[in-house]
Protein backbone atom coordinates (compact mmCIF):
# COMPACT_ATOMS: atom_id res chain seq x y z
CA UNK A 1 0.00 0.00 0.00
CA UNK A 2 2.90 2.36 0.77
CA UNK A 3 4.48 1.72 -2.64
CA UNK A 4 1.14 2.33 -4.32
CA UNK A 5 0.71 5.65 -2.47
CA UNK A 6 4.26 6.67 -3.41
CA UNK A 7 3.55 5.85 -7.10
CA UNK A 8 0.40 7.96 -6.96
CA UNK A 9 2.38 10.82 -5.40
CA UNK A 10 5.03 10.62 -8.16
CA UNK A 11 2.34 10.65 -10.88
CA UNK A 12 0.79 13.76 -9.29
CA UNK A 13 4.19 15.46 -9.14
CA UNK A 14 4.81 14.66 -12.84
CA UNK A 15 1.47 16.19 -13.77
CA UNK A 16 2.31 19.33 -11.80
CA UNK A 17 5.79 19.54 -13.34
CA UNK A 18 4.31 19.10 -16.82
CA UNK A 19 1.80 21.86 -16.21
CA UNK A 20 4.41 24.47 -15.22
CA UNK A 21 4.59 27.00 -18.01
CA UNK A 22 1.70 25.40 -19.89
CA UNK A 23 -1.67 26.88 -20.62
CA UNK A 24 -3.53 23.90 -19.19
CA UNK A 25 -3.25 21.21 -16.56
CA UNK A 26 -0.78 19.13 -18.50
CA UNK A 27 -2.82 17.87 -21.41
CA UNK A 28 -0.51 16.67 -24.16
CA UNK A 29 -2.03 18.84 -26.89
CA UNK A 30 -1.40 22.01 -24.89
CA UNK A 31 2.13 21.45 -23.65
CA UNK A 32 3.29 19.44 -26.64
CA UNK A 33 1.61 20.81 -29.75
CA UNK A 34 1.19 18.50 -32.71
CA UNK A 35 4.12 18.64 -35.09
CA UNK A 36 3.54 20.89 -38.08
CA UNK A 37 1.43 19.15 -40.69
CA UNK A 38 2.70 19.06 -44.24
CA UNK A 39 0.60 20.56 -46.97
CA UNK A 40 -0.34 19.38 -50.45
CA UNK A 41 -1.69 22.24 -52.52
CA UNK A 42 -3.64 21.40 -55.66
CA UNK A 43 -4.50 24.08 -58.20
CA UNK A 44 -7.24 23.44 -60.74
CA UNK A 45 -7.16 26.09 -63.47
CA UNK A 46 -10.01 26.11 -65.96
CA UNK A 47 -11.75 28.34 -68.51
CA UNK A 48 -15.36 27.30 -68.02
CA UNK A 49 -17.37 24.90 -65.87
CA UNK A 50 -20.74 25.66 -67.43
CA UNK A 51 -20.15 24.57 -71.04
CA UNK A 52 -16.67 23.10 -71.51
CA UNK A 53 -17.00 19.32 -71.27
CA UNK A 54 -13.26 18.93 -70.68
CA UNK A 55 -13.21 21.35 -67.75
CA UNK A 56 -16.34 19.77 -66.24
CA UNK A 57 -14.85 16.28 -66.64
CA UNK A 58 -11.50 17.32 -65.17
CA UNK A 59 -13.29 18.87 -62.19
CA UNK A 60 -15.22 15.64 -61.56
CA UNK A 61 -12.05 13.50 -61.90
CA UNK A 62 -10.20 15.79 -59.49
CA UNK A 63 -13.01 15.61 -56.93
CA UNK A 64 -13.06 11.80 -57.18
CA UNK A 65 -9.27 11.59 -56.82
CA UNK A 66 -9.28 13.86 -53.76
CA UNK A 67 -12.07 11.81 -52.19
CA UNK A 68 -10.03 8.63 -52.69
CA UNK A 69 -6.71 9.89 -51.28
CA UNK A 70 -7.65 12.52 -48.69
CA UNK A 71 -8.18 10.11 -45.78
CA UNK A 72 -4.83 8.41 -46.36
CA UNK A 73 -3.03 11.74 -46.76
CA UNK A 74 -4.59 13.10 -43.57
CA UNK A 75 -3.53 9.96 -41.68
CA UNK A 76 0.00 10.42 -43.05
CA UNK A 77 0.16 13.99 -41.71
CA UNK A 78 -0.78 15.95 -44.83
CA UNK A 79 -3.40 18.63 -45.21
CA UNK A 80 -4.86 18.89 -48.72
CA UNK A 81 -5.79 22.32 -50.04
CA UNK A 82 -7.60 22.58 -53.37
CA UNK A 83 -7.72 25.92 -55.20
CA UNK A 84 -10.19 26.00 -58.08
CA UNK A 85 -9.44 29.03 -60.23
CA UNK A 86 -11.72 30.15 -63.04
CA UNK A 87 -9.43 31.86 -65.54
CA UNK A 88 -11.73 34.58 -66.87
CA UNK A 89 -9.21 36.97 -68.43
CA UNK A 90 -5.84 37.24 -70.11
CA UNK A 91 -4.53 38.85 -66.93
CA UNK A 92 -5.50 35.84 -64.81
CA UNK A 93 -4.04 33.47 -67.40
CA UNK A 94 -0.76 35.37 -67.24
CA UNK A 95 -0.82 35.58 -63.44
CA UNK A 96 -1.27 31.79 -63.16
CA UNK A 97 0.90 31.05 -66.22
CA UNK A 98 -1.81 28.96 -67.81
CA UNK A 99 -0.50 26.97 -70.78
CA UNK A 100 -3.73 25.11 -71.56
CA UNK A 101 -7.13 24.55 -70.03
CA UNK A 102 -7.84 22.65 -67.93
CA UNK A 103 -4.66 22.40 -65.86
CA UNK A 104 -4.09 20.56 -62.59
CA UNK A 105 -0.98 21.31 -60.55
CA UNK A 106 0.17 19.59 -57.37
CA UNK A 107 2.46 21.82 -55.29
CA UNK A 108 3.04 23.97 -58.37
CA UNK A 109 3.90 21.06 -60.68
CA UNK A 110 1.68 20.27 -63.65
CA UNK A 111 0.47 16.68 -63.39
CA UNK A 112 1.17 16.27 -67.12
CA UNK A 113 4.00 18.65 -68.06
CA UNK A 114 3.91 17.70 -71.77
CA UNK A 115 0.91 19.77 -72.85
CA UNK A 116 -1.07 18.37 -75.76
CA UNK A 117 -4.25 19.86 -77.19
CA UNK A 118 -7.02 19.13 -79.66
CA UNK A 119 -10.00 21.16 -80.92
CA UNK A 120 -12.64 21.72 -78.24
CA UNK A 121 -16.12 22.30 -79.65
CA UNK A 122 -17.62 23.56 -76.40
CA UNK A 123 -14.98 26.27 -75.87
CA UNK A 124 -15.14 27.16 -79.56
CA UNK A 125 -18.88 27.71 -79.16
CA UNK A 126 -18.24 29.94 -76.12
CA UNK A 127 -15.95 32.33 -77.95
CA UNK A 128 -17.09 31.91 -81.57
CA UNK A 129 -13.68 30.72 -82.73
CA UNK A 130 -11.70 27.52 -83.09
CA UNK A 131 -10.09 26.76 -79.73
CA UNK A 132 -7.96 23.85 -78.61
CA UNK A 133 -8.19 22.46 -75.10
CA UNK A 134 -5.98 20.04 -73.30
CA UNK A 135 -5.82 16.31 -73.83
CA UNK A 136 -4.22 14.00 -71.29
CA UNK A 137 -1.96 11.09 -72.12
CA UNK A 138 -2.29 8.16 -69.75
CA UNK A 139 -1.11 4.61 -70.37
CA UNK A 140 -0.29 5.57 -73.95
CA UNK A 141 -3.78 6.84 -74.77
CA UNK A 142 -4.94 10.42 -75.26
CA UNK A 143 -8.08 11.35 -73.34
CA UNK A 144 -10.05 14.59 -73.17
CA UNK A 145 -10.61 14.16 -69.42
CA UNK A 146 -7.78 13.30 -67.01
CA UNK A 147 -8.40 9.85 -65.52
CA UNK A 148 -8.72 9.74 -61.75
CA UNK A 149 -5.74 7.35 -61.65
CA UNK A 150 -3.49 9.95 -63.35
CA UNK A 151 -4.42 12.55 -60.71
CA UNK A 152 -4.01 10.14 -57.77
CA UNK A 153 -0.59 9.06 -59.04
CA UNK A 154 0.52 12.69 -59.43
CA UNK A 155 -0.55 13.49 -55.86
CA UNK A 156 1.21 10.44 -54.43
CA UNK A 157 4.35 11.14 -56.50
CA UNK A 158 4.47 14.62 -54.97
CA UNK A 159 3.96 13.25 -51.44
CA UNK A 160 6.73 10.69 -51.82
CA UNK A 161 9.18 13.04 -53.57
CA UNK A 162 9.35 15.40 -50.59
CA UNK A 163 10.33 18.21 -52.98
CA UNK A 164 9.41 21.77 -51.99
CA UNK A 165 6.62 23.60 -53.82
CA UNK A 166 7.73 24.64 -57.29
CA UNK A 167 7.79 28.39 -57.78
CA UNK A 168 6.50 29.83 -61.04
CA UNK A 169 9.11 31.48 -63.24
CA UNK A 170 7.38 34.62 -64.47
CA UNK A 171 10.21 35.53 -66.85
CA UNK A 172 9.70 32.68 -69.34
CA UNK A 173 5.92 32.73 -69.68
CA UNK A 174 4.04 34.03 -72.70
CA UNK A 175 0.27 33.73 -73.13
CA UNK A 176 -0.32 30.99 -75.72
CA UNK A 177 -2.03 32.13 -78.95
CA UNK A 178 -4.80 29.63 -78.35
CA UNK A 179 -5.75 31.29 -75.04
CA UNK A 180 -5.36 34.75 -76.56
CA UNK A 181 -7.88 33.75 -79.27
CA UNK A 182 -10.27 32.43 -76.62
CA UNK A 183 -10.23 35.65 -74.58
CA UNK A 184 -10.39 37.89 -77.69
CA UNK A 185 -13.51 36.05 -78.85
CA UNK A 186 -15.29 36.19 -75.53
Segments (PLM) and residue ranges:
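Ala/Thr-enriched low-complexity intrinsically disordered regions
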Residues: 3-5
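A short acidic/basic microdomain associated with nuclease active sites
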Residues: 81-87
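Non-globular targeting/processing and membrane-anchoring segments
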Residues: 1, 10-81, 94-99, 106, ...
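Short, solvent-exposed loop/turn elements at beta->coil junctions and helix N-caps
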Residues: 87-93
Amino acid sequence: QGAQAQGHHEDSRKRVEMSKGCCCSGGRSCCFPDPERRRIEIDFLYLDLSACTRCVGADASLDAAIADVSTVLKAAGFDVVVNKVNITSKELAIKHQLMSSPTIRVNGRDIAPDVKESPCESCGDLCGSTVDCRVWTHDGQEQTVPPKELIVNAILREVYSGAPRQAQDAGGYRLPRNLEAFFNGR
